[in-house]
Amino acid sequence: MVLSNEPAASAAEEEVEDDALVRASALEAFGESAETRALLRSLPAVHRERASREVAEERFRVIMDKYQEQPHLLDPHLEWMMNSLLDLVQDETSLPDLVHLAFKFLYIITKVRGYKVFLRLFPHEVANVQPVLDMFTGQNPKDHETWETRYMLLLWLSVTCLIPFDFSRLDGNLSTQTGETRVPTMDRILQIAESYLVVSDKARDAAAVLVSKFITRPDVKQRKMASFLDWSLCTLAHSSFQTIEGVITMDGMLQALAQIFKHGKREDCLPYANTVLQCLDGCRLPESSHTSLRKLGVKLVQRLGLTFLKPKVATWRYQRGCRSLAANLKLCAPGKSDQKLLSDSLTSDGDEDYDVPEGVETVIEQLLVGLKDKDTVVRWSAAKGIGRMAGRLPRELADDVVGSVLDCFSFQETDKAWHGGCLALAELGRRGLLLPSRLSEVVTVILKALTYDEKRGACSVGANVRDAACYVCWAFARAYEPQELTPFVTAISSALVIAAVFDRNVNCRRAASAAFQENVGRQGTFPHGIDILTTADYFAVGNISNCFLIISVFIAGFQEYTKPMIDHLVSMKINHWDGAIRELSAKALHNLTPQVPEYIAMHVFPALLLMTQSPDLHTRHGAILACAEVTYALYKLATQSNRLVTDYLDEKAVQSLKQIHQQLCDRHLYRGLGGELMRQAVCILIEKLSLSRMPFKGDATVEGWQWLINDTLRSLHLVSSHSRQQIKEVAVSALTALCSEYYVKEPGEAGSSIAKELIPQYLAELQSPEEMARCGFSSALGALPGFLLRGHLQQVLSGLRRVTCISPNDVSFAEARRDGLKAISRICQTVGVNTRGPPDEVICKENISEVYAALLGCMSDYTTDSRGDVGAWVREAAMTSLMDLMLLLARTEPVLIEAHICERVMCCVAQQASEKIDRFRAHAARVFLTLLHFDSPPIPHVPHRQELESLFPRSDVATVNWNAPSQAFPLITQLLGLPTYRYHVLLGLAVSVGGLTESTVRHSTQSLFEYMKGIQKDAQVLQSFSETLLKVFEDNLLNDRVSVSLLKMLDQLLANGCFDIFTAEENHPFCVKLLTLCKEEIKKSKDIQKLRSSIAVLCGMVQFNGDVRKKILLQLFLLLGHPFPVIRKSTASQVYEMVLTYSDLVDAEVLDEVMSVLSDTAWDAELPVVREQRNRLCDLLGVPRPQLVPKPIPGS
């Protein structure tokens, strides 16, 4: 909970976690036991081959990693796994590679289970000492491939050196037969340990463990401890953390010293503690940039401090209950006093005369510095050290430590100090070292920490502080009796609820929820704790919108939390740096207003109005949003009791609301980047005040609002791109609400001069040279209420239709066309349909054709620019608008849906459903199926309805993922069997089959081949298909978007024998027409991709018989003489393959010569040379030589 680092400012919060991650994989036993046995038995066989060895190692690693979160499941199997591997190690016949592999497997197990559990399983008899030592002789500390071996050997040695015999007994006679003296065992072990303390790999950690076990032995400490400490301190003093070698050396020394002072007896280590502390001071570790060194420094300092102080349990500490169940029952028995705080019954500490060594002050000082370190792991270690030290100090000195910790919570300190202070307080509280007399001070700073949020640049810091503050509350719940915390229950419970619901960071919300749950369970004094927990549990608070808008309303239903939650939103969240939090806070205030409307109106609303004039942009923005939401909430409350909103708001508040826009305008706050936020906020204010029916009708304020909306729509191109859409939407929504409330004279009649000028003004803006202005005013026209459109409908539809048409000057204005289509659709919904109605007031028989023309015309918008296929936005809007219009007509006036119109709509949508962009294909499929299955009433004249319903049954529609090509294309290609849809589906498929995206090409091609396979035996259907295919080609000649892809598709169809049935007939019309179209397509073309595709098609067409074959070969030989070398080479290569494929193409006598010419000629040589070889081929194959056509002389 508290170990999470501060998240990066740019990191987006993960609101929804994957269920599999949340649940994790709960295992019950080691299920791979048999596989592991087999794997270990196979090591002697696989270790010789590198590939087999790596496969075995990777498989074992995968098996072990599966148990990283539940390593205890391995415990029953550790012994046999270790024995199997050590047998390989101890076998004298094992090769070095096999030994290293066995140690590598041992390390993998150790990594999962932890070395401390693993140590006790190593063989540790006297007989093992010498073999383990001997194994080190063959080790090279610089060999990076075998570091696992050295690591495991050091751990093994650390166990074997614990044998209960003096090492001198193992040495015997140290003299050898050659007169040399052998090194004593004790010295050998120490030399090994010292040498590995300065290596750069993992063996350094194991060497520190070895030192701690070895140096603290009774026989070794007398002879070697002083000299080792002297060596390590000298090495430490002469090392610098400015170099890599120095960092490695210092890390090893610090680890060794920390382990010695942890495992050694106090009386053995005490004589050296002061010297070590002085050396450590001289190293200046807090100045190091290496986290590991600073952490080890703090760890060593605290262990030195614990060495200075006698190990004892402070008699003055606060105790809640006992570890013994029997003792707890005695305390709870009748007649027994339940004194929990021993200091209350003791006027003096039994050890008050205990002399505290001088070094303790230095240790405490360094630990307090560690609390402010920049890294969490260092602060965490320092906090634990503070807790351990305070537990051995007299009461007064421990209280001074608590006071020093509380000094971390000043606003001059950084967020690091606050975080470290919270961790320290949690440790002190958990250990009973924070006496109840200090609780009032501690709770005060913790409440501040729970809302700590400091602005830093474009974001803020403090999430880790709030998280740690939740940990303090969690620790206090376990540490204190309910009566001790009773005075603070209201404040703590409210603060935790606020953090759980309103904190921006998901980890903090979850930490607060956990702390609240712990307090409810342990203390039992939190108001409505169980009810709140069931709603605001760990998983529920994961979604921030759910927290702000739903959970907060439930909790605010309990009066203890209502006002604190509202006050927190106003004071801390309305002015938050994150715009999303400000918007959510405003909506949350809207939802909370019904709980205490009088408090909101009398106290909160005046404060919000004052904040609207703040010089801080974020405060001003949030306050305006909040005023808008609260006003609308008060209006809804007033409406329920047939009252006016002014019954809640006094005249001063109403006037202040009216003046917000003018005050911002006078201060020029609508300009620049901040102006974007102000425009957005005031547009929302306009919308909410209009919906709240504020009494501003006929007031100049309304004119000011109208000016702001118009100016915002007109200047959208000046708004940053990421905010543009949102600002346009809020301005349009404001316009709708404003017109509906303030421009109505009588029901259904416009009553303002501004209203009458609005439509002509907006229609004029539709011709603006700025695309965004067209977008804004198109959307505005679409959002106008029906009474304003009455009498102007034809004029508006004509203006919007001009926006949707492509002209040479606005080809790239795809967004304007998209918004124009949406506006037309929205207007149709607004004015309604009446077949015989007036065309200037409703959609009727006279103007429906104009609407159809606009929508269907945009279905063929394939505009592309630097952003890609921007026309897809237009086509998507056209599909949606057509669907909405068709459904509207079906419900009201189905007679206006004519058969040819319905057929065109369905065919156009089917074409889009077979194209290459996944998202738009899926949208088209949804539109197509909606139109097909709509039954209220059914849409008339749908072509092939019965066949479509059998192909796309209603029950199966929901299960198909239309975004996935593998699921979409097998269904879409079935439409090729329906003559009405064949042309359009084939047109769409051509783009998909000939596209670039691998998955789309593969699945669309496969589905097309499956269809073609099914019609091979039906000559009539195949003939119809081929005619449609040629029709598509003919209609899209020189349209590179379709023709290039179509050529690729034709190549695939020819190569897969889809037209084999036509090859039996000489000069088949399909081949003749296809050749004509290909020649026309590539005539004078310089498009390399198109030319290459056409070469492939021409080579595939050679399979057809008759005179047409000669014409095809002539065309190919023309390409062999093409001006582009790359085309000549490509043609020669494919013709070579073609000759190999179709053996009847060339006479056997000349085959070798033809193949030789094709393969040996340098087709990228000069044109005269190439054409000579090309002509030679023509002669060999009996094809007329191509003749150069002289260029006409100008003026001749």
UniProtKB/Swiss-Prot annotation:
It comes from the Eukaryota. GO terms for molecular function: beta-tubulin binding; GTPase activator activity. GO terms for cellular component: adherens junction; bicellular tight junction; centrosome; cytoplasm; lateral plasma membrane. Its main location: other. HEAT repeats lie at residues 363-401, 599-634, 752-788, 1106-1142. It is found in: Cell junction, Tight junction; Lateral cell membrane; Cytoplasm; Cell junction, Adherens junction. Belongs to the TBCD family. Tubulin-folding protein implicated in the first step of the tubulin folding pathway and required for tubulin complex assembly. Involved in the regulation of microtubule polymerization or depolymerization, it modulates microtubule dynamics by capturing GTP-bound beta-tubulin (TUBB). Its ability to interact with beta tubulin is regulated via its interaction with ARL2. Acts as a GTPase-activating protein (GAP) for ARL2. Induces microtubule disruption in absence of ARL2. Increases degradation of beta tubulin, when overexpressed in polarized cells. This is Tubulin-specific chaperone D. It comes from Mus musculus.
